[in-house]
């Protein structure tokens, strides 16, 4: 099998990828809120860029802290107001700085776990396209139009945050 274009640059919109090698999403995006995990996590993702990948993707980053969170323990913040938590903003931004330093494109995997949600605290619930019970035995509420609009907005706001 030949991959004639694997190492050729590729233009996607305004972004040029130096090649077509893309790393799968790695690490939880907000794990860098934990100072003890930062250096290892940065080095893990930076190594892919340094090694020649054209694109490195920061892993699972929840778009809100109510019904999107799959793994507990991250400090909630408002994606619309990065100035309110400059430590997290700078820590997340360091991913992009380290990846781009080696000529790779930096992306983030923005997620909403939907019906797979296991509520960890008050005010959290699982929501999905239909009412059901998930594999963990949690009752999932069917999303209404307000939920859909809110979640779409959360994706847009968190995407803007990641682009800053």
Positions of PLM-derived features:
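Flavin-dependent oxidoreductase catalytic cores
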Residues: 1-164
